[in-house]
Amino acid sequence: MSTFSVFNFQFSIKQMTGKLIIFSAPSGSGKSTIINYLLTQNLNLAFSISATSRPPRGTEKHGVEYFFLTPEEFRCRIENNEFLEYEEVYKDRYYGTLKEQVEKQLEKGQNVVFDLDVVGGCNIKKYYGERALSIFVQPPSIEELRCRLTGRGTDEPEVIECRIAKAEYEMTFAPQFDRVIVNDDLEAAKAETLEVIKEFLNKE
């Protein structure tokens, strides 16, 4: 994560009126279903729009699904410390969160929702501190996760095992998050997450 002066950091925080809600989870945890439910609950939530260096697909539009940058533009913005977090998933294929875009949403009073990998989630929580709530969604067990991924019927066995290995790594980050939601019952997990977020948003 980039280093900013204390003055700039405090000034930036002072200008913000919205809050941040960060979600991370292993694939197959039910995170996306929970997030989509929360977006219907009149909490003034707005999804963070990521930047990427991949080309648009189909009807995707710049500034709607993603901010589309060339690899050169992305690297230039990295050098200028414009990202809260970013990842190069493979050569010249970047994804990241632009600080300027998040601050625009916060200044509008929106509560910004992030769906990030564990490292990106921890970085944003560290940057924004108490203004951010970090939530880790996890399955009740690795065996249950394996059953869910197998039940999808979309991945080959070797792909599933790679996802399981990644999940085991990601779950080691759970203690770094403010709250851990164990999704062994989807409706209960949705209700628990909603209450956690309401409590957070109502805090001064």
From Swiss-Prot:
GO molecular function: ATP binding; guanylate kinase activity
Catalytic activity of the protein: GMP + ATP = GDP + ADP
Keyword GTP-binding: no
Pfam family, one: Guanylate_kin
Protein name as catalogued: Guanylate kinase
Family as reported in the entry's similarity comment: Belongs to the guanylate kinase family.
Keywords: ATP-binding, Cytoplasm, Kinase, Nucleotide-binding, Transferase
Function: Essential for recycling GMP and indirectly, cGMP.
Annotated Guanylate kinase-like domain residues: 18-198
Source organism per UniProt: Bacteroides thetaiotaomicron (strain ATCC 29148 / DSM 2079 / JCM 5827 / CCUG 10774 / NCTC 10582 / VPI-5482 / E50)
Any one of the GO CC terms: cytosol
